[in-house]
Design a protein with these regions (language model features):
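C-terminal helical "tail/cap" subdomain of flavin- and related membrane-associated enzymes
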Residues: 231-347
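Mobile, glycine/GP-rich and aromatic-enriched active-site lid/loop segments adjacent to catalytic centers
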Residues: 129-133, 139-161, 167-190, 197-198, ...
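Short amphipathic alpha-helical face segments that pack within enzyme cores
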Residues: 28, 32, 79, 218-225
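A conserved beta-strand/loop capping segment in the N-terminal third of enzymes
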Residues: 1-32
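Predominantly flavin-linked oxidoreductase catalytic cores and closely associated redox partners
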Residues: 36-173, 209
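FAD/FMN-dependent oxidoreductases across multiple families
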Residues: 51, 68, 153-230, 235-238
């Protein structure tokens, strides 16, 4: 439940959406954005890019039909799963792809009524004591339920361990709902080099993005910074260093705090007592609407990306948070207390 009693999550489809989802009434988010920018004057050229070269200190794009064109500036707004990432070795600056890990996404299809009955209108987030498991979420989208997983060296064994966990089965009995499509996309964990060169700049997932969070938010911020630099200052590597990189650096520094927070979360979720304390603290906050929802706000922001990691970390240093967490930890350790189920879901 949102700690501020408002709905702030929009569940949407990328590209063509799930396999077999052609009858879904909403258009894809990608198409919506493309049509919007076309209405603002952008020109869409439907060419497949098969190569990126540096000719006479200018970027040259090779097309699938054998032709190509030279450009004053090339902004790469592709994801880390795009083939164009592998074509950038010849661009100035010796671009290296970001560090990545694999996630897992699976679409389960039922009926709109059944998904609403089982999942309601809430995103369900799971913190389970499974080796190599970081976190997962189940998101209702009309007749579909989207399962998103993040973990270390994620493989089919880890996927099956999560889907067959009793806590997950209580929320979504995956054995009785067909999985219509799945994929294991790469996730950006951080840039290995500066995401720019002379007349070439990477925005969004191909460059710097927020750790485990919405790519479009970081793409907007870095895209705006790149456009501002190009229009008002220039397109050289030095220009991007001075006017574009500070935005990327802020995201990178915030991600360092995020890594610390996720490492702390991994330690706490693997302890039965700390899991109980987190759950008890969040439950008490949900019941008592007059007190500040410290844990609820932290969990909400951690898994929705509604706040920077630095802001979340500062929230954990508030006396109220520390006091309530200490009380909840003490209650979890107190013998004879009513036990919360051994495996908890944090949703």
């Amino acid at each position: 439940e949102s700690p501020v009693q408002v709905r702030r999550i929009a569940a949407l489809d990328r590209g063509n959406g799930p396999r077999g989802g052609g009858d879904v009434e909403l258009e894809s988010f990608d198409n919506y954005l493309q049509e919007m920018v076309k209405g603002l004057g952008a020109r869409v050229i439907p060419h497949m890019i098969t190569g990126v070269e540096n000719r006479q200190n200018m970027p040259f794009l090779k097309y699938g039909d054998g032709k190509g064109a030279q450009y004053d500036l090339v902004a790469i707004a592709a994801g880390v799963n795009s083939n164009i990432i592998k074509m950038l070795g010849d661009v100035p600056g010796d671009y290296l792809p970001p560090k990545t890990t694999r996630g897992y996404i699976c679409e389960f299809r039922s009926t709109r009524e059944e998904i609403l009955r089982v999942l309601g209108r809430a995103v369900h987030v799971f913190l389970l004591d499974i080796p190599r498991f970081e976190f997962a979420a189940i998101i209702p989208k009309g007749p579909f339920a989207t399962v998103v997983m993040v973990g270390e060296d994620l493989d089919q064994d880890l996927v099956h361990a999560f889907l067959n966990d009793p806590v997950v089965q209580r929320v979504l009995p995956t054995n009785s709902v067909p999985c219509v499509c799945s994929c294991a996309p790469l996730i950006n964990l951080g840039a290995r080099k500066r995401p720019y060169g002379n007349r070439v700049v990477m925005v969004g997932d191909s460059g710097v993005t927020r750790l485990y969070k919405d790519g479009i938010g970081a793409a907007f911020r870095t895209g705006k910074a790149a456009a501002t630099c190009a229009v008002f200052h220039g397109v050289s590597s030095a220009d991007f260093e001075k006017y574009f990189w500070p935005t990327c650096r802020n995201i990178t520094n915030d991600n360092r705090v995020g890594k610390v927070m996720f490492a702390t979360n991994a330690i706490m979720k693997n302890s039965r007592f700390s899991r109980r304390a987190m759950l008890r603290m969040a439950q008490k906050e949900q019941k008592n609407k007059t007190s500040y929802p410290h844990m609820s706000t932290l969990l909400w922001n951690m898994f929705t990306g509604s706040a920077p990691y630095l802001e979340m970390f500062r929230g954990t240093l508030r006396p109220g948070f520390i006091y309530k967490l200490a009380v909840s930890l003490g209650a979890s350790l107190w013998p004879g207390r009513k036990q919360i189920n051994k495996r908890e879901e944090m949703a």
